[in-house]
Design a protein with these regions (language model features):
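Single conserved hydrophobic/aromatic residue that forms the stacking wall/gate
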Residues: 165-174
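Short, ordered loop/turn segments at secondary-structure junctions
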Residues: 45-47, 102-103, 110, 128-130, ...
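Rossmann-fold NAD(P)-binding glycine/threonine-rich loop
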Residues: 102-123
Length: 174
């Protein structure tokens, strides 16, 4: 089975859950994806927050982006400035990217996708749009015979939850 060496940056709520799932249930990824994920380095601004995972932890996030063994960088730190530097450095170093960072994709997506294209790497960002609904996969794979030039809509989890609550009888009753 093929093995992919991964670096994870960010161990907050999302990053911590990702590390926990990869550590506690690796067989799910192996069985569903046909690949073994080896987390070889973790970048955590507060190093102690990642100690419970018994992994190679650094507080210097760019060390993960510059680690020649890391093949895929999972960016889960949030925000724009540091995340952009981290992703750009990783792409320039030939690493594929996975991110759940809505702000990063909304603000710098076009330039990051162009940089990724130049360096022949992929950016996975499905978790950063539409509240995790697999809309990107549907557009890329399900509509492959169609030419989609532009797509607009309110596609985020917060708005979806808000609209759901507005339609509930308990909210609308007087």
């Amino acid at each position: 089975m093929k093995s992919i060496k991964v670096g994870v940056c960010g161990v907050g709520n999302v990053g911590g859950a990702v590390l926990e799932n990869l550590s506690n249930s690796p067989e799910i990824v192996e069985n569903n994806g046909g690949v073994k994920i080896d987390v070889i380095q973790v970048g955590a601004r507060k190093g102690k927050s990642a100690v419970s995972f018994d992994l190679n932890v650094t507080t210097e996030l760019l060390d993960v982006a510059n680690n020649p063994e890391v093949e895929v960088l999972i960016e889960l730190i949030g925000g724009c400035d540091l995340a952009k530097d981290l992703v750009e450095t990783s792409i320039r170093n030939g690493k594929h990217i996975v991110t759940a960072n809505k702000a990063l994709i909304a603000t710098h997506g076009d330039e990051l996708f162009e940089l990724a294209k130049e360096h022949n790497v992929q950016i996975g960002f499905e978790a950063s749009v539409a509240g995790g609904t697999p809309v990107i996969k549907a557009l890329r794979e399900g509509l492959v015979a169609n030419k989609v030039n532009w797509f607009a809509g309110i596609l985020n989890g917060t708005t979806t939850v808000s609209y759901t609550h507005l339609t509930l009888p308990t909210i609308c009753s007087v």
